């Protein structure tokens, strides 16, 4: 039976560090503040907003919301972003995406000030992931994967790692973060030839394929660590990951469950980025 890499244990440790930093900031008269910008009434956005708001409250971080109609114009949204960019008491901004199709998402994303970009929305923030410079912040989900590896003492140095998925949101930044941990990394995608055999060669596999249960027993071997980023709803209406947990768990050494794995850490990473943004501002 594989060891379960439980997100709640990682979150508890991360939250303690965040609380200590919040106390330090408040001692200097600074109240770290997140601003959430939501366009329209997407249920998944509303759900994440609810979770982020609750986590902020728990950790002593202020959370403001700007709720805009689904038919908001490009100019109106850009003006909103410009306003929060100039608001000194707001340290981090989360804009829910994807945006409605009548909006130019790339232009809007890059209008945000990188120092307030707590979920790697801008091109400048993404460049920071690849250069190692503190420009903005890395995406919260791949950062949550790294927090899990760190918390459970899984050393990546010299290990073979496979990332399944090549999105800019998870796959590519996760691969770069693993490289920084001295792993030898392969990125797999829909055009990869014989993906199961490639995945079986790895010591660590991060799965961000975007399809429920796509990674089965043929992808894994004994001794592996599996990080499942996927969040899907199966035919029974239950949450499940991109990994076929029932098939994979008996084989591998360690695995994150869904739910209860990466997703539960991601929200604390977001709040931690807001606090770090405030600390960067205070410390210059």
Role assignments for model-derived ranges:
Residues 31-40:
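Short beta-strand segments enriched in small/hydrophobic residues
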Residues 106-126, 230-282:
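Rossmann-fold NAD(P)-binding glycine/threonine-rich loop
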């Amino acid at each position: 039976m594989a060891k379960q890499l439980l997100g709640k244990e990682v979150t508890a440790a991360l939250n303690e560090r965040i609380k200590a930093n919040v106390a330090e900031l408040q001692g200097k008269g600074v109240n770290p503040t997140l601003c959430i910008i939501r366009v329209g009434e997407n249920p998944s956005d509303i759900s994440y907003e609810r979770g982020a708001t609750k986590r902020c409250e728990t950790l002593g971080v202020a959370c403001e919301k700007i709720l805009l109609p689904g038919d908001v114009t490009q100019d109106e949204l850009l003006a909103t972003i410009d306003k929060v960019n100039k608001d000194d008491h707001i340290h981090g901004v989360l804009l829910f995406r994807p945006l409605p199709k009548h909006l130019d998402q790339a232009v809007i994303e890059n209008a945000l000030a990188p120092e307030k970009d707590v979920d790697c929305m801008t091109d400048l923030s993404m460049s920071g992931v690849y250069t190692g410079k503190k420009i903005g912040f890395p995406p919260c989900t791949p950062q949550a994967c790294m927090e899990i590896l760190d918390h459970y003492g899984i050393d990546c140095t010299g290990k073979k790692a496979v990332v399944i998925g090549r999105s800019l949101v998870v796959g590519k930044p996760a691969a770069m973060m693993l490289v920084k941990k001295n792993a030898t990394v392969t990125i797999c995608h829909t055009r990869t030839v014989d993906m199961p055999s490639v995945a079986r060669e790895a010591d660590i596999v991060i799965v961000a394929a975007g399809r429920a249960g796509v990674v089965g027993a043929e992808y894994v071997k004994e001794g592996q660590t599996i990080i499942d980023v996927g969040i899907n709803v199966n035919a029974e209406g239950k949450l499940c990951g991109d990994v076929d947990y029932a098939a994979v768990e008996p084989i591998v050494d360690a695995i994150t469950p869904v739910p209860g794995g990466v997703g539960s850490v991601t929200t604390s990473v977001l709040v931690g980025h807001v606090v770090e943004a405030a600390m960067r501002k205070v410390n210059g």
